[in-house]
């Protein structure tokens, strides 16, 4: 193809999926990317496919960067198009550090998720208010019940479930779900009408994934996890993948394989990854873009 005709070809929009036939039907869909906004099922919350996690080894990796280094990392992620940031009560100072890092960025330009520890003897509303203050935000887009690791969690956390619904009524929380660990807990996700979304451990090797013992050091049951992911997505739940890179133990090739597996095999909506360098952010974006190609 001559250079002239190549330019004319590109102008038609075929390369970006904009050429249409009669009736305006696209001949080719636009390419999907890591920073596209996707809806997390019936939660209705729109997030980027790639999230910014702050819980590497319970947040130690991110805390060790110090506020200045962590802020640079968050701003790099934002500049690269990541618009979904998540943390948890159990990650130490990460609510406060994330609030500082995001200060000055329009609140309606990104989504913020927190995860609450479902303790007895704690007021849910007081805890949500505390976390909002620490994160310097009026509301969380998503609040998860964190670290649900028993088969009885839907009954055990009833008070916290009601507390989240109350917070939603006050517009302190937009939507909700749970993060689950271990097959007994995961098996209670399908058919759970309270859940709008679930955070589930997914990768291709089973590293740090769900087994009968939630705390096992052995590979998890990949096939059963994927079965549950597919089922809950059919039910309309959103699914966020965690432990995608085996808690930081995977090399580059396995990180790429894990990303492909999460989206192409398991069919998750979104993945969260914890970072310590800007290069890791850039690589995660590249890996996800390749997985979607």
Each model region followed by its residue ranges:
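Alpha-helical scaffolding within the catalytic cores
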Residues: 33-38, 95-96, 124-131, 183-184, ...
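Acidic (Asp/Glu)-rich catalytic clusters
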Residues: 42-44, 99-107, 131-137, 190-193, ...
């Amino acid at each position: 193809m001559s250079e002239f005709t190549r330019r004319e070809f590109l102008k038609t929009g075929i390369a970006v999926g904009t050429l249409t036939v009669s009736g305006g039907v696209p001949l080719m869909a636009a390419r999907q990317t890591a920073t596209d906004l996707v809806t997390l099922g019936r939660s209705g919350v729109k997030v980027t496919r790639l999230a910014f996690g702050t819980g590497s080894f319970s947040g130690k990796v991110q805390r060790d960067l110090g506020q200045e280094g962590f802020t640079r990392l968050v701003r790099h992620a934002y500049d690269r198009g990541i618009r979904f940031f998540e943390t948890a009560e159990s990650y130490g100072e990460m609510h406060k550090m994330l609030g500082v890092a995001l200060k000055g960025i329009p609140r309606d330009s990104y989504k913020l998720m927190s995860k609450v520890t479902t303790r007895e003897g704690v007021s849910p509303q007081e805890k949500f208010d505390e976390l909002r203050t620490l994160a310097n935000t009026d509301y969380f887009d998503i609040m998860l019940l964190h670290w649900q690791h028993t088969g009885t969690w839907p009954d055990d956390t009833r008070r916290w479930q009601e507390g989240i619904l109350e917070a939603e009524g006050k517009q302190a929380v937009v939507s909700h779900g749970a993060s689950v660990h271990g097959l007994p807990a995961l098996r209670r996700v399908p058919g759970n009408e309270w859940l709008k979304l679930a955070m589930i451990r997914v990768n291709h090797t089973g590293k740090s994934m769900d087994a009968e013992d939630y705390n096992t050091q052995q590979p998890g049951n990949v096939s059963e996890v994927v079965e549950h992911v597919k089922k809950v997505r059919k039910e309309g739940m959103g699914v966020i993948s965690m432990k995608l890179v085996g808690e930081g133990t995977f090399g580059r090739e396995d990180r790429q394989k894990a990303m492909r597996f999460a989206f192409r095999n398991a069919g998750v909506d979104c993945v969260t990854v914890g970072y310590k360098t800007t290069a890791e952010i850039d690589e995660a974006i590249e890996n996800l873009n390749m997985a979607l190609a």
